[in-house]
């Protein structure tokens, strides 16, 4: 299996309507400040699949993704929804506030982002997968992975050299009746207090969960 997949999306609210000055914005309540839901959201992802053997039993998957939640009025700032959280498997993916959960195996969902989420996220991952068993109705595979990512509070804070990293291994079961179920054992290499020595065991359901 070899190939590429590129996805880009731009989501925007209605055209900006607020005309608050800095002084006016400071006196507004949160409900008043964000009543127009003025924002735009950009996402880009690139996935590359490369077979390393003629029988296609070993495949290297490389993924890159970036997402940004922007605003039209700097006095109002970033809306309190649609933000990014990073860590874990991202199995939740979305919540009622339209926040997005980007997986970074080896970490928990609260380990990387701020408590309210961040408007900017970036992630790079590599996974080397080997088929172990394959039939018409079932496939079992094992894999090694390395992931790098972070979230930032603004574009100014973006630092591609400041990425959290993790390594690990796992396995996946593919079956038409149950879909895809996976298990990963990962080490978050940037955890503090030597917590990186204790691996995180995490489960996934479905394909591309926790990606952009």
Where are the predicted features?
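Short Gly/Pro-enriched loop/turn and capping motifs at secondary-structure junctions
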Residues: 133, 149-151, 178, 188-192
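Outer-membrane beta-barrel "beta-signal"
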Residues: 173, 198-212
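Outer-membrane beta-barrel transmembrane domain signature
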Residues: 103-105, 149-166
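C-terminal outer-membrane beta-barrel translocator/porin domains of Gram-negative envelope proteins
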Residues: 1-132, 137, 144, 152-154, ...
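Short glycine-rich, acidic/polar surface loops and turns
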Residues: 129, 166-172
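Outer-membrane beta-barrel translocator/channel fold
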Residues: 185-201
């Amino acid at each position: 299996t070899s190939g590429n997949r590129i996805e880009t999306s731009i989501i925007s609210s209605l055209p900006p309507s607020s005309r608050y000055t800095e002084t006016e914005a400071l006196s507004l309540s949160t409900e008043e400040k964000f009543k127009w839901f003025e924002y735009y959201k950009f996402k880009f992802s690139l996935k590359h699949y490369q077979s390393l053997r003629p029988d296609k039993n070993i495949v290297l998957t490389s993924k890159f993704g970036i997402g940004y939640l922007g605003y039209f009025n700097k006095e109002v700032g970033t809306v309190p929804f649609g933000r990014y959280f990073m860590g874990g498997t991202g199995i939740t993916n979305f919540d009622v506030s339209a926040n997005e959960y980007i997986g970074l195996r080896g970490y928990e969902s609260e380990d990387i982002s701020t408590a309210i989420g961040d408007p900017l996220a970036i992630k790079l991952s590599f996974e080397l997968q080997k088929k172990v068993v394959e039939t018409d109705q079932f496939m079992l595979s094992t894999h090694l992975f390395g992931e790098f990512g972070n979230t930032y509070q603004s574009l100014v804070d973006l630092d591609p050299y400041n990425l959290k990293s993790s390594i690990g291994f796992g396995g996946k079961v593919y079956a038409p009746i149950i879909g895809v179920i996976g298990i990963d054992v990962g080490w978050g290499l940037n955890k503090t207090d030597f917590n990186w020595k204790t691996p995180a065991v995490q489960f996934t359901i479905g394909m591309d969960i926790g990606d952009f």
